[in-house]
Curated annotation (Swiss-Prot):
Residues involved in isopentenyl diphosphate binding: K73, R76, H105, R122
Protein name: Heptaprenyl diphosphate synthase component 2
EC code: 2.5.1.30
Keyword Magnesium: yes
PANTHER family per the UniProt record, alphabetical: ALL TRANS-POLYPRENYL-DIPHOSPHATE SYNTHASE PDSS1 (PTHR12001:SF69), GERANYLGERANYL PYROPHOSPHATE SYNTHASE (PTHR12001)
Reactions it catalyzes: 4 isopentenyl diphosphate + (2E,6E)-farnesyl diphosphate = all-trans-heptaprenyl diphosphate + 4 diphosphate
Binding of Mg(2+) 1, residues: D112, D116
Cofactor dependence: Mg(2+)
Keywords noted in UniProt: Isoprene biosynthesis, Magnesium, Metal-binding, Sporulation, Transferase
Cited PROSITE patterns: POLYPRENYL_SYNTHASE_1, POLYPRENYL_SYNTHASE_2
Family affiliation: Belongs to the FPP/GGPP synthase family.
Pfam families named in the record: polyprenyl_synt
Stored InterPro entries: GerC3_HepT, Isoprenoid_synthase_dom_sf, Polyprenyl_synt, Polyprenyl_synt_CS
Length: 348
């Protein structure tokens, strides 16, 4: 199945703006410029997020603000706002959807860091590292509860149903990841299902619910859902590639951290096709150190695993563009296209 997907990916045209060596900083600026006209509304979202994570309990507030202030691209809120422009855009309504989805994402990060025993997130200590696992778990739970309370301000039964189904799927994705740690026998289907549940669905629903909350036609919000889904799949695959090709400074965590924590990603699945590498990869376990992993990472980079994974990411990105082209032309569509292009080129 890996070969079939790779052949399909390589048969699609490559996305290019004529400058494949775009500087990381310039690329990041292009990403932010794609939605700069929404900066005032993004500020509204930031204030709402800060207010939502605050609690009467100082420790909860401190932990929540610690994660919030670590930064992040806020891709999900941006997708909510841009998708809302396909209907009757009202920031005072749509902000609740944007905050809800970012809070769910943040809660999943806190829980992820406990599961993976991660010390760093975006270059700063994780909540579990700064406090402990119990504080981290309850902070994540508090954020999830806060997100659900926020969503009650939207009187859209369909949106509530979609959101509840998505949360169930996200939880299943987390459970699958725990179950498959250090399992080098898993297949591509398992990996794709896991990244769909852990990443792609939340981005897909960000696009869909933004449109639903603004009263957009069903045809539009369904197309936006699939655009978000394909972008989300591409985004996670790029994330998994960067775990090998980026630097600790850019990642904000050790290179190869996913593999060290036992998470088998697409580059690893391709690398497993190399018999010698497969034997080395199967020896990785919870006792493996960063120093022991470094030569294996270098060997993976020497194979075609990174290139093959990039081809699959680009295949999903092309599918996203195909869905986007069915939507009405305008500023929102142009911005979504620019963001999707950025995702295919991002370096961190």
């Amino acid at each position: 199945m890996l070969n079939i997907i790779r052949l399909l990916a390589e048969s699609l045209p490559r996305i290019s703006d004529g400058n494949e060596n775009t500087d990381v900083w310039v690329n990041d600026m292009k990403f932010k410029m794609a939605y700069s006209f929404l900066n005032d509304d993004i500020d509204v979202i930031e204030r709402e997020l800060e207010q939502t994570v605050r609690s009467d309990y100082p420790l909860l507030s401190e932990a929540g603000l610690h994660l919030l202030q670590a930064g992040g691209k806020r891709i999900r809120p941006v997708f909510v706002l841009l998708s809302g422009m396909f209907g009757d855009y009202d920031i005072n309504k749509i902000k609740y959807v944007a905050v809800t989805l970012e809070m769910i994402h943040m809660a999943s990060l806190v829980h992820d860091d406990v599961i993976d025993d991660a010390e760093l997130r975006r270059g700063k200590p994780t909540i579990k590292a700064k406090w402990d696992n119990r504080i981290a778990m309850y902070t994540g739970d508090y954020m999830l509860a806060g997100s659900l309370e926020m969503m009650t301000r939207i009187n859209e039964p369909k949106a509530h149903r979609i959101l509840s189904q998505t949360i169930v799927e996200v939880c299943l994705g987390e459970i699958e990841q725990i179950k498959d740690k250090y399992n080098m026998e898993q297949n591509l289907r398992t990996y794709l299902r896991r990244i769909k549940r852990k990443t792609a669905l939340l981005i897909a629903v960000s696009c869909q619910l933004g449109a639903i909350a603004s009263g957009a036609d069903e045809k539009i919000h369904k197309a936006l859902y699939w655009f978000g889904y394909y972008v989300g799949m591409s985004y996670q695959i790029i994330d998994d590639i960067l775990d090998f090709t980026s630097t600790e400074e850019e990642l904000g965590k050790p290179v190869g951290g996913d593999l060290l924590q036992g998470n088998v990603t697409l580059p690893v699945l391709y690398a497993l096709k190399n018999p010698a590498l497969k034997n080395q990869l199967k020896l990785i376990n919870s006792e493996t150190t960063q120093e022991q992993l470094e030569p294996i990472i270098e060997e993976i980079k020497k194979t075609d695993a990174i290139e093959a994974s990039m081809a699959v990411s680009e295949m999903y990105l092309q599918k996203a563009f195909q869905k986007l082209n069915t939507l009405p032309r305008g500023r929102a569509r142009s911005s979504l296209a620019a963001i999707a292009k950025y995702i295919g080129k991002r370096k961190f």
